[in-house]
Design a protein with these regions (language model features):
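Substrate-binding/charge-relay-adjacent region of secreted/lumenal peptidase catalytic domains
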Residues: 24-247, 269-308
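An alpha-beta-alpha
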Residues: 260-263, 268-270
Length: 308
């Protein structure tokens, strides 16, 4: 079990509004990104690994009980979420995603997920795991080690926050915005009620058209990590149709909440260069779309435990 940063969609169930951080990213110590930088038109995953963490008997990162406590989500440990489907959209294949998530769940006493198919996941009354390619089939793309670690992080966090939810992993053929967006549409078509997107890339002039094509799904909660390179906005976090999730540093404390939490300067934030400010944003800091909307633990120095 290793410790990593998290920008998981499930955290948007209940979080506080994030402000804009204009500082440079804080030093990461011995943490490192698991995905390389992306060229124009492509995205990079936003996971980091703490390379100082050893394979100890007990995980050193934050576990499900910590996250439920920190964000007052204890009700989700019961029956909440049963029958609901969270989709994880990432690029490339993680061949061991199903077995890995059940190792994570066993570590924390969470019942294992059953196996189901993409077409049946949304109807399952028993928490189950399904995997599809970007068009809903089961011929998967090639493996990528960095993206596979991101997938482990995302699937583990969905399990931690909503153990009774079904999990649908949709793997895009590549990290292009076109392929990832196609995977988002497929996730919605397969019945997902929440779609997590833990990736991002440089903004581009055609993103207003792309957001309408891939992210405009009324009634579906679509969340996107805001990035992990400090001040600046990425797509698709800039979309008006998503909840952009920023990052914090989270530590246990002796206060009433039991936790202290501060903004993490490595999280992406700022003003979009292209997306019009939506009517539901009333801040005066940006003339266009402001990023981020909510925040959760993301600092690699205070990260979560992940099995990969």
């Amino acid at each position: 079990v290793r410790r990593a940063t998290v920008f998981a969609a499930a955290f948007t169930l209940a979080l506080t509004t994030a402000g804009i951080a204009d500082a440079a990213p804080a030093p990461h110590g011995h943490a490192q990104r698991v995905c390389s930088a992306a060229p124009a038109g492509f995205a990079a995953c936003n996971a980091w690994i703490d390379t100082d963490t050893t394979f100890a008997a007990a995980p050193s990162g934050l576990g499900p009980a910590d996250l439920l406590s920190a964000y007052n989500l204890g009700s989700l440990a019961g029956s909440a979420g049963a029958g609901r489907t969270i989709a994880i959209v990432d690029a490339y294949d993680a061949p061991t995603a199903f077995s890995d998530v059940n190792v994570y769940r066993a570590q924390y006493g969470i019942p294992a997920l059953a196996s189901c198919t993409p077409s049946s996941v949304n109807a399952s009354t028993t928490p189950c795991f399904a995997k599809s390619n970007q068009t809903g089939g089961t011929t998967y793309p090639r493996k990528d080690g960095g993206w596979a670690q991101e997938i482990s992080l995302d699937v583990d966090m969905a399990s931690a926050i909503c153990p009774k939810c079904n999990i649908l992993l949709v793997e895009a053929s590549s990290a292009s915005f076109t392929d990832l967006g196609t995977a988002v549409n497929t996730a919605v078509n397969l019945g997902a009620e929440v779609v997590s997107n833990s990736y991002g890339g440089s903004e581009f002039s055609g993103e207003a058209s792309a957001e309408g094509q891939y992210f405009n799904h009324p009634g579906v909660a679509i969340t996107v990590s805001s990035g992990d390179s400090g001040y600046g906005v990425e797509f698709p976090a800039a979309s008006r149709y998503v909840t952009a999730v920023g990052g914090t540093s989270l530590k246990k404390a002796s206060n009433t909440r039991g936790w202290s939490e501060t903004a993490w300067s490595g999280a992406g934030s700022g003003c979009s260069a292209y997306i019009t400010k939506p009517s539901w944003q009333t801040d005066s800091g940006c003339g266009r779309r402001t990023v981020a909307d909510v925040s959760a633990v993301a600092d690699p120095a205070t990260g979560v435990a992940v099995y990969d």
